A protein has these predicted regions:
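General structural signal for secondary-structure boundaries
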Residues: 2-3, 33, 51, 113-119
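N-terminal topogenic membrane-targeting module
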Residues: 21-91, 98-103
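N-terminal signal-anchor transmembrane alpha helix of single-pass membrane proteins
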Residues: 1-34
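Intrinsic low-complexity, intrinsically disordered segments enriched in polar/basic residues
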Residues: 5-6, 40-41, 150
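Cytosol-/stroma-facing membrane-proximal "stalk/adaptor" domains immediately downstream
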Residues: 89-162
Length: 162
């Protein structure tokens, strides 16, 4: 009797978790069939493209996953920006390579089912600001590590402020 109650309780809890999540995924599918990810976030992607890729980025959509989109540029091959939309949340991932060291930065934005133009601009600007800081830190750290690994007189007197 006790095992049956525990089993039913576990099934009930799993249903409470699984059913709303599944409904959100169905909403995503319906929403993205009417309004693909590149159209839904057109302003946001445009601002990121203009500032981070000098307006030369190209969008890549995936037939097998309409929730995923990449933004990259031939001019800046060391940078890839991925967008993943799921359950009303947008995750933007920056992949940036500098001197063979990769920076991966991920930021999630929630509650974006009904997104205004102003919200898209704000999200894009927030992401760009954070990424610019992360890229500068990465370049400084990788550049400093690269210089500090060199031997001989070239490294004498080198400090983090240089």
């Amino acid at each position: 009797m006790t095992i049956t109650l525990i089993f039913l309780l576990v099934i009930f809890v799993l249903a409470l978790i699984f059913v709303p999540f599944t409904r959100q995924l169905v909403k995503d599918k319906e929403e993205l069939s009417r309004n693909p990810i590149n159209k839904k976030f057109e302003i946001l992607v445009g601002v990121i493209n203009d500032i981070m890729l000098d307006g030369k980025g190209e969008i890549t959509l995936f037939d097998d996953d309409p929730r995923l989109m990449n933004l990259m540029s031939e001019d800046k091959r060391n940078m890839l920006i991925q967008f993943h939309y799921s359950t009303g949340n947008l995750t933007i991932i920056l992949n940036y390579k500098f001197l063979q060291k990769e920076l991966v930065y991920k930021k999630q934005f929630s509650g974006l089912r009904n997104l205004s133009v102003f919200m898209q601009r704000d999200i894009a600007n927030e992401f760009i600001e954070i990424c610019n800081k992360k890229i500068a830190e990465h370049q400084q750290n990788v550049g400093y590590m690269d210089m500090s690994s060199m031997s001989g007189a070239h490294c004498q007197g080198l400090s983090e402020s240089d």
